[in-house]
Amino acid sequence: FNGYLIMTVLATGIIYPIVGHWAWSSSYLSKYEAVDQLLAITGTVKTTGWLSDLGFVDFAGSTIVHSVGGWIALAAVIILGPRIGKYSDANRGKFTGSSFPLAVLGTLILWFGWFGFNGGSNGAMDETVPLILINTFLAAAFGLLTGLTISYLKFKKPDPFYIILGPLAGLVAITAGCNSMTSVTSIFVGIIGAIIAITVNEILNKFEIDDVVGAVPVHLAAGVWGTLAVGLFSDLTILDTGLDRFSQIKIQLIGIFAIGAFTFISSYILLSLYNKFFPLRVSPVQE
């Protein structure tokens, strides 16, 4: 628990502010009079981040919020290792959540809250908000249907984990471009996001990387896809970056790689150092 608290402080105090400045500073800092006053006094503070200057777009945070959390989670689970017996032949398939009904309820609450998350990121109640809300719903709904379909194809029955994974991946994926895509495109983004998340979850299990809550498939993988989808499918006139389609895709990839590399490397180093002095994992007896 102490390790979790330390990482939370490091993430919110160091990692998130840095990547947030890289990509969002031109959108937010310029609105505050205090920043203008600081500029007038010092003349040295740069209000725009380098990714923002390049034209990187992540409307509500598929990468800046979700993938960052996913990269931190990946570093943590690699350092911690799998739970005892998780991948033994005797226990395969037996490590499940304690209450799937509560997990599904939590998913529905998240889904509802996402309307405020994406809609509120617009900063104003204007004609853009209905499109944002519709796209958010469609991506989640078709992510759910995709998870359900894959579950039936694989297990011949609905699997709660896939049903939870699908809509959450759709929500994460559409977050970056919910204001600049058509409704049909948002459906496609949600479907592909769910497929990617489920695939990544299987890959993690194959390599015995124990991600208990599916943070890496949902937040990292679907977040990367959603950010790339902005370059692939968003209306360039709405993005208003002055870039053509190919250039926008290139800048999105640069942003994904830069933020991912910085977040994973810094969090892995910080967690490894902390783990040397204060073990992140409980003792085998406690576990």
Locate predicted features.
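Hydrophobic alpha-helical transmembrane bundles of multi-pass membrane proteins
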Residues: 1-287
